[in-house]
């Protein structure tokens, strides 16, 4: 009465997940495949529902967050915050005590996949869609994010902590010694500029692997992996998108997209820089 493949779920946890999914989907047959994980303790699976002839009738994403109930709640909070503005996965079922969620599945086509061998005009169309999606997220009121959804600030402590990853990991990797006083002064100067920028909702991982082509509607990008969202500088997510660690573009193309984003912010009547040059400077300060 079911078919399962769960390579990375073992023992009692597998039984719990299997039983819960049987309850959620009324004992339908299903196949469960584990997906590559991220750096967290969360595990992700794709569930395919089957009819009696083994024909697929639906598919969803299953999140297993056994030891991260707080993270699970934060995921739900952020999803509810973002859902009216952008295309995030619909929550289908949840069990907070067990640490399980079932979510809408956008499919397997990442933004990065769309760019491969695409002509320049098509690439630009994709980036315009990603920019419009980003500005729609930035239009969500910060007050709503703080009061109704408990989003934290991207504050000095967090910025310091993340910048120190650069000095702790990258600098030793390239074999350079960095004078501590120089580094602390540089961090302080950068943080002061970053905190002075207009504050918006920041996804924190807005890049080509966390944007999906929604298989139900190719005109919309599905946005995933948003649970670490914060309130922070309006340049952060744009840097993640146009200076993506996974995709590289000529600097004149990057500059063009930065200016496009500024225009979109102005059209949406968001707080932004007075001119395109200042906006690009803010983006360059960020990364």
Role assignments for model-derived ranges:
Residues 45-161, 172, 196:
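ATP-binding pocket architecture of kinase catalytic cores
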Residues 5-27:
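Juxta-kinase regulatory segment immediately upstream of eukaryotic protein kinase catalytic domains
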Residues 27-45:
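ATP-binding glycine-rich phosphate-binding loop
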Residues 61, 87, 101, 200, ...:
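Protein kinase-like catalytic core scaffold
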Residues 41-48, 137, 189-236, 248-249:
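Active-site acidic catalytic loop and adjacent metal/ATP-binding pocket
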Residues 164-173, 234-272:
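Active-site activation/catalytic loop segments of kinase-like enzymes and analogous catalytic loops
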Residues 2-3, 272-287:
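Short, intrinsically disordered, charge-balanced linker/junction segments flanking boundaries
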Residues 17, 23, 142-152, 157-158, ...:
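An alpha-helical support segment within catalytic cores of ATP-dependent transferases
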């Amino acid at each position: 009465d079911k078919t399962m493949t769960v390579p990375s779920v073992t023992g009692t946890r597998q039984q719990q997940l299997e039983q819960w999914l049987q309850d959620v989907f009324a004992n339908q047959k299903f196949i469960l495949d584990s997906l590559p994980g991220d750096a967290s303790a969360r595990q992700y699976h794709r569930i395919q529902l089957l009819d009696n002839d083994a024909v697929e009738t639906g598919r969803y994403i299953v999140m297993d967050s056994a030891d991260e109930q707080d993270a699970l709640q934060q995921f739900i909070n952020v999803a509810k915050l973002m859902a009216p503005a952008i295309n995030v996965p619909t929550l289908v079922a949840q069990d907070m005590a067990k640490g399980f969620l079932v979510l809408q599945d956008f499919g397997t086509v990442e933004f990065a996949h769309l760019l491969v061998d695409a002509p320049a005009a098509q690439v630009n169309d994709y980036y315009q869609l990603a920019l419009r999606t980003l500005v729609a997220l930035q239009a969500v009121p910060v007050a709503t994010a703080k009061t109704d959804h408990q989003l934290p600030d991207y504050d000095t402590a967090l910025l310091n902590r993340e910048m120190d990853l650069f000095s702790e990991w990258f600098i030793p990797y390239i074999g350079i010694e960095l004078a501590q006083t120089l580094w602390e002064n540089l961090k302080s100067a950068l943080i002061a500029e970053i905190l002075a920028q207009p504050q918006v909702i920041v996804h924190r991982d807005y890049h080509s692997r966390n944007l999906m082509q929604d298989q139900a509607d190719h005109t919309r990008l599905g946005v995933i992996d948003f649970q670490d969202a914060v309130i922070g500088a309006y340049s952060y997510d744009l840097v993640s998108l146009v200076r993506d660690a996974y995709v590289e573009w000529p600097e004149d193309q990057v500059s063009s997209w930065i200016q496009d984003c500024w225009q979109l912010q102005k059209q949406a009547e968001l707080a932004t820089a007075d001119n395109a040059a200042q906006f690009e400077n803010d983006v360059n300060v960020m990364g």
